[in-house]
């Protein structure tokens, strides 16, 4: 079982994953804060909505049941980080990765180091995450238009549990950020926040 040290008084929090390689792991720090506030307002989940980040090499990684990773550029995990992230995920931790455009090749390369024999699988629209709280019958929303490719969602499973969820060409976390950051419409932002709520509810329900 995953030991949630930091979830005092039953509160749920998210930690942004800090990684090496040059990618902007830190972009849009308002994203998680806004998502967690939305979750608290629309579900019975009690949250700690502070912005928090953690390095893979830190013992603090095991204090968070949910890690969030995003960015535009390169990602590099050291051998020690690969082992620690694998241990975290195998012991019940959950990682959500949102490609903010330009992250795909690096994410796939580095996650293959973590799970060499466990590849990303594209999730069908019938998968439970897409209807666990709000209904997304066509899968991930297209929040931020980078090009004309369809939004897609991928997963890595450990003993039938979704341990890693990865959105590509979707970018819902842009819709979580403060409205002035990306100028997404109110409708797009609400859709993105609802989708993020589904991810959290699904991660907690497994």
Can you name each region flagged by the protein language model?
Residues 1-3:
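Bacterial N-terminal signal peptides
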Residues 6-66, 70-73, 171-172, 178-206:
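Aromatic-Pro/Gly-enriched surface loop or interdomain linker
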Residues 10-12, 62-66, 90-94, 118, ...:
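Loop/turn elements at helix/coil->beta-strand transitions in domains of secreted/extracellular proteins
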Residues 14, 66-105:
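Short alpha-beta junction capping motif
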Residues 21-22, 30-31, 104-180, 188-197:
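An acidic, glycine-rich "communication" segment
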Residues 45-55, 97-100, 118-126:
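Surface-exposed patches in mature extracellular/periplasmic domains of secreted proteins
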Residues 49-56, 78-84, 148-152:
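Alpha-helical scaffolding within the catalytic cores
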């Amino acid at each position: 079982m995953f030991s949630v040290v930091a979830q005092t008084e039953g509160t749920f929090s998210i930690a942004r994953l800090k990684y090496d390689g040059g990618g902007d792991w830190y972009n849009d720090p308002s994203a998680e804060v806004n998502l967690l506030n939305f979750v608290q307002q629309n579900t019975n989940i009690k949250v700690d909505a502070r912005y928090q980040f953690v390095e893979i090499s830190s013992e603090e990684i095991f204090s968070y049941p949910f890690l969030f990773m995003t960015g535009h550029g390169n990602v590099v995990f050291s051998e020690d980080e690969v082992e620690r992230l694998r241990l975290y995920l195998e012991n019940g931790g959950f990682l959500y990765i949102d490609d903010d455009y330009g992250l795909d090749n690096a994410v796939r390369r580095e996650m293959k180091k973590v799970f060499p024999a466990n590849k990303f699988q594209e999730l069908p629209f019938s998968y439970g995450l897409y209807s666990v709280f709000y209904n997304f019958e066509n899968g991930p929303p297209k929040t931020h238009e980078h090009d004309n490719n369809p939004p897609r969602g991928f997963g890595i499973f450990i003993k039938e549990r979704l341990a890693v969820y990865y959105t590509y060409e979707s970018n819902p976390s842009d819709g979580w950020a403060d409205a002035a950051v990306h100028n997404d419409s109110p409708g797009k932002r609400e859709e993105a926040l609802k989708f993020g709520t589904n991810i959290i509810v699904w991660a907690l329900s497994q």
